[in-house]
Amino acid sequence: MNTVDFAWLSKWILRNIPDLILFLGVVTIQAVGVWWILRGPAANASRRVRTTIVSLAIASFAVLSFGFLLHFMRVSRHLPLWLNAWGRGSIIAWALISVLLVLAFGAAEALPKARPEHSPARRNFLRAAHIALFAAPAAAVGYGVFIERLDLRLREQSIAIPGLHPDLNGLRIVQLTDIHLGAFLAERQVERAVAIANETRAHIALVTGDLISFQGDPLDACLNRLARLTAEAGIFGCLGNHEIYAGTEDYTTEAGARLGMRFLRDAAAPLRFGDATLNLAGVDYQHLRAPYLVGTGKLVRPGALNVLLSHNPDVFPVAARQGWQCTIAGHTHGGQVRVEILHQNLSVARFFTHYVDGLYREGPASIFVSRGIGTIGVPARLGAPPEVALLRLCRT
């Protein structure tokens, strides 16, 4: 294999590792689940029932394989954006439902079995419990797609800043992030988010990345609607990873500037409020494979309140060491789909970052991570409703 082929293969592997891991993980869980069902609950079932179970498993494997092949062969790029997005989302949703169904079978087996000597009421209760277990996965995904995904709300969060200048006490900052305008989010949802933000009468309006999901999504429409944000000091922002994926970093910056929005790309904007200065800085998306915030420390302004906009929240420990008193981020969608068990929120995002949702502190420094507005991958939210965030600075 020559050098060119090896470079291409390495790039292909790195690009497809997340999807390959997801595909193999789901298929493995399905295979183990089917094997367990055939050996356990369906061991004495009729041949027709066992054949049906195997046929459904094969069909599921075929659908998941077809979706993965379409993706890695890049056939999906030739499909209409809405069909590509919803097709991929549906396959991911089915993967999620199928895994939950396997877990439901396990839970159902753990339930007591109805016996002839049991009362009719007990038999009915156990029957209802089994039905509820199997219906719950589909019901949860349906709720996430059709209800919670569209349940946009205002979230208010106070951020205590040690030694905050009195003229900055009570300063209101409104944040919109992870909009992902496209197949999964209509323009009217962006308009609604802007209307909610404007009702806060904020001093500063922020847009912290991922305006769209893919190349060809309606970026201009998103920018035009975001330009309707109103704030005393103006509209500022930073870019996210999807601006990079879509190749729109420069266009977003230039088109935003024409509309009155300033995207800060390794740059700072000192804002005066009375006798106080808020030094607002922003960085482009910080990649996992490179050191965070290289050279960003030089933007810190002594004597000012230093606030950093970074789409990726993982920069927080570095930002705190550099002297940024407050970091504002997005990227995680709050996990997008998460379940609370024993007062612990479980989500895929937990595997990638400690900073999933809300306010975190490290010494005197703080970071706020917003759940954002849109979705990616699967058009659903569960346990992580979309939000417009209103941040209030306050003295400790």
Language-model regions, residue ranges each:
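Non-catalytic terminal accessory segments
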Residues: 1-150
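Soluble catalytic domains of enzymes that build or remodel membrane lipids, polysaccharides, and related
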Residues: 155, 160, 164-396
